Structure formats: C-alpha cells, structure tokens
Amino acid sequence: MNRIASYLRTYATEAERPMATDVQPSESDVERLLRQRNVGISAHIDSGKTTLTERVLYYTGRIKDIHEVRGRDEVGAKMDSMELEREKGITIQSAATYCNWKATPPTERSNMTGDAADESTVTTQKKHDYHINIIDTPGHVDFTIEVERALRVLDGAVLVLCAVSGVQSQTMTVDRQMRRYSVPRLSFINKMDRAGANPWRVVEQIRTKLRMPAAAMQVPIGAEDNFQGLVDLVRWKAVYNEGTKGNVVRESDDIPADVLELAREKRQELIEQLSDVDDEMAEIFIEEREPTIEELVAALRRATVACRFSPVFLGTAIKNKGVQALLDGMCAYLPNPMEVRAIANDTAVAKKIAAQANEEGHDVAAMQSSAQHGSEVQLVPATEAPLVGLAFKLEESRFGQLTYMRVYQGILRRGGIIFNSRTGKKVKVPRLVRMHADDMEDVQEIGPGEICAMFGVECSSGDTFTDGSTTLSMSAMFVPEPVISLSLTPEGKDTSVNFSRALNRFQKEDPTFRVHVDSESSETIISGMGELHLDIYVERMRREYNVPCTTGKPRVAFRETISQPAKFNYTHKKQTGGAGQFGRVIGYIEPMTVDEDTGKDTAFVNSVMGGNIPPSYIPACEKGFADGLEKGALAGYPVCGVRMVLEDGAAHSVDSSELAFRIAAHAAFREAFRAANPTILEPKMSVEVIAPVEFQGTVIGALNQRKGTIEDTEVREDDFTITAEVSLNDMFGFSSQLRGLTQGKGEFSMEYKKHEPVMPNVQADMEAAYKKSLEKK
C-alpha cells in the first residue's frame, strides 16, 4: 500500500509536460498497473524470438503444450498463425497475446526446491501475479513496419540475440527503433547450447555496436552442448531447469567451483557498469561498499526504465533453459504503464498557437514547430479520465476489419461511441476482444495501459480515438519509404474485382506496401521494403483471393534531389479569349533533411506577406509543388529532400485562378530544380553475409565485384561474418550466386541504409535513356 500511495503522490509532480486531465489514477488503477507489463520481443531473423515466446506462453500456462516453428510437428508455433509463416519458418505479421505470471522478486531470498518428476513450476514462499501483454514481431527487415508499430505502443522490450552470431544487421535496426520511441529493453542471449556460443563477446557487442551500457545478470554453468544452468548474479544462486520441458526450476546456494571465480568477476562487472549510469550505485562503488540485493535491484530498475542500461539474461529457448528467469526479469526491471510518459497533442491548443504565430508574422516552419511542442500534454492512465487510444495495426479477418488498439487513458467499452480525431467521425464499437495470436476472447471493456482489438471500426493505422470530450491526438509512427518495386498483372479472366480488393486491403494493413498505376505503361506497380516483402503479398493474393499474378522485373526506387538552393520568379500567363490564366510566384527551393517530428523530407512553406497572393490560392501553389515532386527533371523519378519557400507573387483580379497558380508553382519548381544542381539517388543497402570460414575470400570477391564497400569482418572458429554497403541495384541475383559459391552453406540479409548519389557516368546514362524515352512519345 505504501508503494501505491507513493505513486499517487508523485505521478503529477514528476510530469515533464502539462497533464491531459486533472484526474489522477485511483488506488485500484495503481494497484492493477503496478502488476502489468506491455512487452515486445524483437530480434534479427532466426534468433529465436517465436521459440522464446512459445516457451513464455507454455510456462505461464497460456498454452498446454510446446510446438516448434516451421510446423515440424504439423502444428507450428502458436504465434505463427499464418500458413505462410509455418511453411517458411519466419514471422511475417506481429502477433499479440497475453498471459499471467507469478514472478519471484529478485529480493526474494528463499530457495526453490522440488521433485524433478513433478512437471509443474515449483512455488516459493512469496510470488506476485503479473499480467503481461506480449507482441511477437518479425525479424526479417522486409517486415520492419511490424516492429515499428509494435514498439510505438509498448512500454518495454526484450531484444533477443544469438549467442553465436551476436549483434547482426536487423539487431541494429531494432535498436534504432527502440531508441526512436524510448523503449527500455532487456537483452536475452539465446542459443547458449550451440557450438561456438560466446555470451561475453555478445555483451561487448551490445556495448560497442549498439552503444548501450549492458552487463550479464547471469553466468552459464557448462558450455555449448553441456550447458546445464545459470548462476544468478543478483541473488547469488545456481539455477537449474529440470523436467522434460524445463518446468521445474531448482535453486541452490552452492555455486559450482569451476564457475565461482568467473561469477565473482562478472558480478563486480555488473556493479561497475551500473555505477557508470546510476548516481546512487556510483556512490556505493566509490565508498567501496558491497551493495545489498535491494540496492542492486533498485539501481537496475532505475537505469533500465530510464533507457540507460540493458540487463542481459542468458538461456536457450529450444532447450527450455533460462526462460523463467527472463520472465521474472520482465516483471522486475521493465516499466509498468505509469512509468512511461505517453504524450499527445491538443489540436485546439496547436491551432491557437499557430494562429497567434501567424498574426505576429513568424516563420511558418518555426510556427509549426512551436505549435507541435507547445500543445503537448502527458496522458494519465486513469479509468476516470477521458478516453484516448491509438489504433496501431489493422488486419482483415473472417469477421471484418480488426483494429488493434492501445488504450492510454480512460475506458474503451463494447457498444460505446468513440471519435476518430483525424476524421472527426464518431463510430460505435460493436465488438471488443483480447487477442491470443489468431484466437480471441470477447471482453466488455478495456482500461488504461491495456492492448485490445476492435471489430467493425473503419480507420487507418495511426488514428487516435477519444470519447469526444477532448481534442487530443497522438503522433503517428515512423513509416520508412519503399526501396523496391515491380509490376503486377493478374492472370485469367474475372479477377479484377478480387485483385483490387486485395490491393486495397494490403495497403490498409501495411503502410510500407504502396500501389500505383504507371501513367506511361498503365501497369499496376507495387512497392515495398524488399523482394521477400513483395513476394509474400503476391503469394497471399493467390491463396487468399484466388488471384494468381505475373510479376515483372524488380525495379529500384531511385530518387532525385538537389544539392544547393535556387531562386524562382515565374509568371504563368495564358490568354485564349475571355477570361485567361495568370499567376506569378516568387521564392526559392533548398535542400532539406528529414524532419524528426513529421518524418518527412519535403515541405512547402508559405512566407507570403501583404497578400500579393490571395490566401485562397496558397493551397493551389502547394498542389503545384506536390505535382513537381512526382517526377524529377533528370530521369522522371520522385523528388525528395526539397523545401519550397513561397515568398511573393502577383495575382490578377479576373484571370487568376487556382489552376493558374497550380501550373505556375509546378513550372517554377521544375525551373528552379534544374538550377539547383540536381542529382539522382540510389538506395544503399547494409549487407551481412555469414558463411563457413573457408569461403571468406570468395565471398569478399563477390561483394567487390558488385562494387560493395566492406565495412566490418569478424572471423570465428568455423564461420565468418562480413558487413558491406552495396547498391540495391547491384544486389539482384546475389542469393543464387552465394549459394553456388558456398555450396549452399552461406546466408545473407540486407536492409536499407540510405539513399546516395549514383556515379556521374551512371547518372549521365540514366538521363540519356530518359530523354530518349520522351522523344519516342
């Protein structure tokens, strides 16, 4: 009760921003939220995320038996519910579930004892019941949006790493995503039973490659295929999983002699690492005093919740070892929903700030930034507060559209009326469910801090829902731009309806899946994050909609941009008898980097003073700018990284119109674009290759042949890892080449890194080819 009272006293006083409501969490809110965790499990592909989640569900009693990925037992892992996921052995869509866990507090000193023949988890004198919402995310970079939107709504995460491979390319992507949303994380080094497992190398990689202070919470007893158990460095006990499925957890005060010295060394290392990021632990370290278990646990929790430290747990999910300790760690060190500061924008306040700034003649970009930050409020996880929830994922089910929702404050009720803050529309919630992969459980209401799903609510991913009493809106998630495209043609007759239906559904579900019709060839073009990403959607179209398709050759997502500012002063004048067309625009364009608040790298800024261009024509000028972004002047690729600033102009009382100013702005943009030293950009990929060490020279030669730049090489006893930067345009066909070079033993992954200018000779060829294609028309 003292802890509850403490939360009630300090919740409002610790707020960094104005509170969204005067209502505070009640005692029952605090009591419930203290025992709740919202956790995502993320990692590089094949690190064992889904296998780990399967064990978590089994040990918490959520499922009755353990099944493996790839459907080896003709059942498949619970969280891989799609047929394609079970066939390919990869997670394609993030899957949500929930479970309850009786956690042993790290400060609990009593031993666990039990009969190994008893297949139930052994109890202790004191345990606490925790409710855990879990989202299992894909590891393949092509499905990175699934990780993005999961981390947007979660309070904590488990970053799974392979004990052999360590930090890999997608690990670094997930790390960036966790930092983007300030998500505290535990690290779990999986596959400790594999040959070549080296947890200390992986811990060092977390510190150096991910730049995250970290230390092991455990020391392994035995190595590789002789991996037997773990030494808990906080509670100073030897821990063993026994029973056929690791259900029985046995603890002992006797630390094996062969690991005793290492355990002492690693415990001291844990304290030293913590003292670098926690002031209270630093004082204890300076005093050369041994911290108590309570002091150590408190410091671990403070540093983890503040995203300054990552506790590292060890285990092997496939061999059922170390999972229960990780569950205890989730409950002990990851934040509850009250410890995460959820921020929303009050749109009414934002409009007032923007209007005031406009009246005072401030720069438009500064005005927008001021309105964004000045309207921020902190949401309160109280049931009595006005409802605020975020729709973070859409999915089509046999019952209609399924909308996943995180409730931040207030209560969402079945049959209740909610308002979409983006559209202003009100909708009724016909059905409310908790998800367990593809199964669901109907509920009547969901409180703050919970994750649920709604049926029959039309919306878009990233929409905010309220009860209509507030003008709050939460920021949407970051959506990366597609890097690859291909043409798609449905086979057979009478497939056009299902073809359109499938494309519309896939676009609603996945913001990184884009569709457009090529204006020149009239082909349907789909764009996405990689070849596998698009292949999955083509296959889903065949299976789910009975629409087999023919695909064209993949196309790289080239872009055009500028490298210096350029002014424009353009007049569009046309007289054809009667009312003509007149519009004059003056201003400049300049290079622009990605805006951290909006995630966009193009912007139109209205700096017109004095009304030389009537305000009613400004939106038409912005549309003209948008028209210019669609096709660059060099090779017809979309334009990025440009800000257009409109400073002045002129209008005619009779001949001016929206169309005239739209044409004028478009022509002015194209004219200035040519004068701004434009260049063509191509996507550069971070490529990671793992293969047996005897093929190292051959693989490096293949990457050099594709004009790759080797960035890092790590050689182990049996295999090696090479990281290189290669143009996506040079990576087609590498998969089959690598199989041939390594006798099928090599594997690679790649992820988008950045867009960079193409070589001058390549740009000249692309410009010539584009000019030639225009001449043929």
From Swiss-Prot:
One of its GO terms (biological process) is mitochondrial translational elongation. Signal peptide: none annotated. It is found in: Mitochondrion. SMART domains: EFG_C, EFG_IV. The keyword Transferase does not apply. It comes from the Eukaryota. SUPFAM superfamilies: EF-G C-terminal domain-like, P-loop containing nucleoside triphosphate hydrolases, Ribosomal protein S5 domain 2-like, Translation proteins. GO terms for cellular component: mitochondrion. Mitochondrial GTPase that catalyzes the GTP-dependent ribosomal translocation step during translation elongation. During this step, the ribosome changes from the pre-translocational (PRE) to the post-translocational (POST) state as the newly formed A-site-bound peptidyl-tRNA and P-site-bound deacylated tRNA move to the P and E sites, respectively. Catalyzes the coordinated movement of the two tRNA molecules, the mRNA and conformational changes in the ribosome. NCBIfam families: EF-G, small_GTP. This is Elongation factor G, mitochondrial. It comes from Malassezia globosa (strain ATCC MYA-4612 / CBS 7966). The gene is MEF1.
